[in-house]
Protein backbone atom coordinates (compact mmCIF):
# COMPACT_ATOMS: atom_id res chain seq x y z
CA UNK A 1 0.00 0.00 0.00
CA UNK A 2 2.29 2.78 1.22
CA UNK A 3 5.54 1.05 0.31
CA UNK A 4 7.26 1.12 -3.03
CA UNK A 5 9.30 -1.46 -4.92
CA UNK A 6 8.73 -4.26 -2.42
CA UNK A 7 9.05 -2.23 0.79
CA UNK A 8 6.93 -3.69 3.53
CA UNK A 9 4.54 -1.54 5.51
CA UNK A 10 6.32 -2.55 8.72
CA UNK A 11 9.61 -1.17 7.41
CA UNK A 12 7.89 2.08 6.48
CA UNK A 13 6.24 2.38 9.91
CA UNK A 14 9.56 1.72 11.65
CA UNK A 15 11.20 4.45 9.62
CA UNK A 16 8.41 6.92 10.36
CA UNK A 17 8.62 6.14 14.10
CA UNK A 18 12.38 6.73 14.04
CA UNK A 19 12.01 10.10 12.29
CA UNK A 20 9.19 11.09 14.66
CA UNK A 21 11.43 10.21 17.62
CA UNK A 22 14.22 12.39 16.21
CA UNK A 23 11.90 15.40 15.96
CA UNK A 24 10.42 14.79 19.42
CA UNK A 25 13.90 14.65 20.95
CA UNK A 26 14.36 18.34 20.06
CA UNK A 27 11.49 20.32 21.64
CA UNK A 28 11.25 24.07 21.00
CA UNK A 29 13.23 26.23 23.46
CA UNK A 30 11.59 27.75 26.53
CA UNK A 31 10.82 31.50 26.31
CA UNK A 32 12.66 32.45 29.50
CA UNK A 33 15.91 34.19 30.31
CA UNK A 34 17.54 37.23 28.77
CA UNK A 35 17.05 38.19 25.15
CA UNK A 36 20.54 36.99 24.27
CA UNK A 37 20.01 33.64 26.01
CA UNK A 38 16.69 33.12 24.18
CA UNK A 39 18.31 34.03 20.87
CA UNK A 40 21.15 31.56 21.46
CA UNK A 41 18.71 28.78 22.40
CA UNK A 42 16.63 29.43 19.27
CA UNK A 43 19.75 29.48 17.11
CA UNK A 44 20.95 26.14 18.54
CA UNK A 45 17.44 24.68 18.21
CA UNK A 46 17.23 25.71 14.54
CA UNK A 47 20.65 24.16 13.89
CA UNK A 48 19.53 20.88 15.50
CA UNK A 49 16.33 20.99 13.41
CA UNK A 50 18.45 21.34 10.25
CA UNK A 51 20.55 18.36 11.33
CA UNK A 52 17.44 16.29 12.06
CA UNK A 53 16.00 17.24 8.65
CA UNK A 54 19.17 16.11 6.87
CA UNK A 55 19.34 12.87 8.91
CA UNK A 56 15.67 12.20 8.09
CA UNK A 57 16.38 12.70 4.41
CA UNK A 58 19.33 10.34 4.62
CA UNK A 59 17.19 7.70 6.38
CA UNK A 60 14.44 7.98 3.77
CA UNK A 61 16.80 7.77 0.83
CA UNK A 62 18.99 4.95 2.18
CA UNK A 63 16.45 2.72 3.89
CA UNK A 64 13.42 3.25 1.69
CA UNK A 65 15.01 4.41 -1.55
CA UNK A 66 13.02 7.66 -1.61
CA UNK A 67 13.77 11.32 -1.66
CA UNK A 68 13.04 13.31 1.49
CA UNK A 69 11.31 16.00 -0.56
CA UNK A 70 8.52 15.20 -2.99
CA UNK A 71 9.20 15.70 -6.67
CA UNK A 72 7.99 19.20 -7.62
CA UNK A 73 4.75 19.33 -9.54
CA UNK A 74 5.22 20.50 -13.11
CA UNK A 75 2.66 23.21 -13.90
CA UNK A 76 1.75 24.45 -17.36
CA UNK A 77 2.92 27.94 -18.37
CA UNK A 78 0.95 30.78 -16.77
CA UNK A 79 -0.25 31.96 -20.19
CA UNK A 80 -2.31 28.76 -20.55
CA UNK A 81 -3.98 28.99 -17.11
CA UNK A 82 -7.44 30.59 -17.04
CA UNK A 83 -10.14 31.23 -14.48
CA UNK A 84 -12.96 30.96 -17.02
CA UNK A 85 -15.74 28.74 -15.67
CA UNK A 86 -17.54 28.44 -19.02
CA UNK A 87 -15.24 25.71 -20.32
CA UNK A 88 -15.18 23.02 -17.64
CA UNK A 89 -17.23 23.67 -14.53
CA UNK A 90 -17.49 20.83 -12.06
CA UNK A 91 -20.93 19.86 -10.82
CA UNK A 92 -19.83 18.65 -7.40
CA UNK A 93 -22.44 20.49 -5.35
CA UNK A 94 -21.56 23.94 -6.62
CA UNK A 95 -24.50 24.51 -8.95
CA UNK A 96 -26.42 27.66 -8.22
CA UNK A 97 -23.64 29.15 -6.14
CA UNK A 98 -22.69 32.66 -7.17
CA UNK A 99 -23.70 34.45 -10.32
CA UNK A 100 -22.51 34.06 -13.90
CA UNK A 101 -19.41 36.04 -14.68
CA UNK A 102 -19.76 38.95 -17.08
CA UNK A 103 -16.60 39.88 -18.91
CA UNK A 104 -16.14 43.65 -18.82
CA UNK A 105 -13.17 45.62 -20.04
CA UNK A 106 -11.31 47.06 -17.09
CA UNK A 107 -10.95 50.85 -17.16
CA UNK A 108 -7.46 52.21 -17.51
CA UNK A 109 -6.81 53.46 -14.01
CA UNK A 110 -3.46 55.12 -14.50
CA UNK A 111 -3.91 56.27 -18.08
CA UNK A 112 -2.78 59.81 -17.39
CA UNK A 113 -1.24 61.56 -14.42
CA UNK A 114 -4.31 63.71 -13.73
CA UNK A 115 -7.20 62.96 -11.40
CA UNK A 116 -10.74 62.99 -12.74
Curated annotation (Swiss-Prot):
Location of this chain's protein in the cell: Host nucleus, Host nucleolus; Host cytoplasm
Residues with PTM Phosphoserine: 5, 8, 92, 99
Sequence segments annotated as region (Homomultimerization): 18-26
UniProt modification remark: Asymmetrically arginine dimethylated at one site by host PRMT6. Methylation impairs the RNA-binding activity and export of viral RNA from the nucleus to the cytoplasm.
GO BP terms, alphabetized: mRNA transport; viral process
Source taxon at top rank: Viruses
Primary role: Escorts unspliced or incompletely spliced viral pre-mRNAs (late transcripts) out of the nucleus of infected cells. These pre-mRNAs carry a recognition sequence called Rev responsive element (RRE) located in the env gene, that is not present in fully spliced viral mRNAs (early transcripts). This function is essential since most viral proteins are translated from unspliced or partially spliced pre-mRNAs which cannot exit the nucleus by the pathway used by fully processed cellular mRNAs. Rev itself is translated from a fully spliced mRNA that readily exits the nucleus.
Protein name, as recorded: Protein Rev
Organism: Human immunodeficiency virus type 1 group M subtype B (isolate SC) (HIV-1)
